[in-house]
Amino acid sequence: MNKSNTISRIGTPLTHNATKVMLLGSGELGKEVIISLQRLGIEVIAVDRYANAPGHQVAHRAYVIDMTDGVALAALINQEKPDLVVPEIEAIATATLLEMENAGNVRVIPTARAAWLTMDREGIRRLAAEELGVATSPYRFADSLKELKAGCADIGYPCVVKPVMSSSGKGQSKLNSADDIEAAWNCAAAGGRVDTGRVIVEGFIDFDYEITLLTVRAIGADGATHTHFCEPIGHLQVNGDYVESWQPQAMHPGALQKAHDIAKKVTDNLGGLGLFGVELFVKHDMVWFSEVSPRPHDTGMVTMASQEQSEFELHAKAILGLPVNVAMKTPAASAVIYGQHDGEVVAFEGVADALRVPGTDVRLFGKPESFARRRMGVALAAAADVETARNNARTAAAKIKPVAHSR
């Protein structure tokens, strides 16, 4: 992409010359992207499937639509006429975005094709493994319980079953024997983001650790697109859902180079500008590709404490064609604050106690409804070393107690 394809100047919000960005998906990650865009003078339109989403609370305008409805999505884009459309979730009518981009009616970040390929696990897995030749775990796809049984038999045990479309680990199961298949099928059906009934079976990799490699495609001073890598982020997942992350994750030099090579190969193919969260499994100097999100990643929330520019600032600047700085300033960690109970109105106790833990900060997302395992906030901690940061982040997160609050 050259300079003619980027935004050459930034207008003034809420005027006729405003530079307008529409976010499709307005959760906690979208909220931080919106804040970063607004600091750069961008007029932001936030869209989500439910009212009062975190990003709705800080945007210039907010809409509630079914984003998988192509007609409704196209109508809203045509109404607002944004300079950029920025998908922040997978469950979007990506075929509509492809049509509109091909017709020259909209610019999608990073590209409509990237949004389409990464909307489910099948598109990106086939691209990485079958087209690009990137190392992945062995896999099969299944549309029925019968096909799932055959897929598990082919892959062997242990294996992992996931819906082809889900988020935050929902619907994932680890299977140790054929006795686990039916429960895994039901779990996937309940946890899928869209009711396709299709799952992926993956061979279980006995990795040492897993990382997110935040990879940024941005315009350089020469007008060409350059790839930048943040320091690797380690993370702990429980049932496929992130509970802690830290930066940097120590890596064998050979493994780090392989991680860079894989991330660049995949993101070069996806194209466009912006930040990508590339998930990888690592065992000594061996690296396997897992997934990629063409947007900020939940494990990357640690960068709000660890980097000169957070992943949200990097994404905002990159998509606008502005310079980026991926430098890390300190080791840091994040720990999730869960809802702990079900309810529509939530209050938080212990925030002051959490902030008394050395080097900590807190982000409460403002979600209007709580579930026991819903991510309602995150504790951040910076320290001289990763272990201290992790301990402090966990300690701070544990001090915050979501409680039911009557209207």
From Swiss-Prot:
ATP binds at R121, K162, S167, S168, G169, K170, G171, Q172, E202, G203, F204, I205, E210. The gene is purT. This is Formate-dependent phosphoribosylglycinamide formyltransferase. GO terms for cellular component: cytosol. It comes from the Bacteria. It comes from Herminiimonas arsenicoxydans. Mg(2+) binds at E279, E291. PROSITE patterns: ATP_GRASP. InterPro entries: ATP-grasp (IPR011761), ATP-grasp_carboxylate-amine (IPR003135), ATP_grasp_subdomain_1 (IPR013815), PreATP-grasp_dom_sf (IPR016185), PurT (IPR005862), PurT/PurK_preATP-grasp (IPR054350), PurT_C (IPR048740), Rudment_hybrid_motif (IPR011054). GO terms for molecular function: ATP binding; magnesium ion binding; phosphoribosylglycinamide formyltransferase 2 activity; phosphoribosylglycinamide formyltransferase activity. N(1)-(5-phospho-beta-D-ribosyl)glycinamide binds at E28, L29, E88, D298, K367, R374, R375. NCBIfam families: PRK09288.1, purT. Involved in the de novo purine biosynthesis. Catalyzes the transfer of formate to 5-phospho-ribosyl-glycinamide (GAR), producing 5-phospho-ribosyl-N-formylglycinamide (FGAR). Formate is provided by PurU via hydrolysis of 10-formyl-tetrahydrofolate.
